[in-house]
Amino acid sequence: MATKKAGGSSRNGRDSAGRRLGVKKSDGQYVIPGNIIVRQRGTKIHPGINVGLGKDHTIFSLIEGRVEFLTKQSHKIVNVKEIANV
């Protein structure tokens, strides 16, 4: 006879790695074409002027300039403002 009861195996104890989502460039930061500004699931933040939207809803810069976040009619929007050449 067993002197100890068999220990049950736990059904927990696993977790997936984080997906590294979120804002990658903040308001006023300098970007070049192709720089990722936001990684997201769905369009929590909408693309504005001079930014592109990838098939995974990643927002990226199309031009060289500064990032600008704003809210219009309860939509968060991100633009890239061109820097004037002096």
Curated annotation (Swiss-Prot):
Membrane-crossing segments per the record: none
A Pfam family this chain is assigned to: Ribosomal_L27
Annotated Gene Ontology cellular component terms: ribonucleoprotein complex; ribosome
GO BP annotations, alphabetical order: translation
Keyword Glycosyltransferase attributed: no
Keywords: Ribonucleoprotein, Ribosomal protein
Region listing for Disordered, in residue ranges: 1-26
The keyword Ribonucleoprotein is assigned to this record: yes
InterPro entries given in the database record: Ribosomal_bL27, Ribosomal_bL27_CS
GO molecular function, one term: structural constituent of ribosome
PANTHER family: LARGE RIBOSOMAL SUBUNIT PROTEIN BL27M, RIBOSOMAL PROTEIN L27
Family named by the database record: Belongs to the bacterial ribosomal protein bL27 family.
Protein name per Swiss-Prot or TrEMBL: Large ribosomal subunit protein bL27
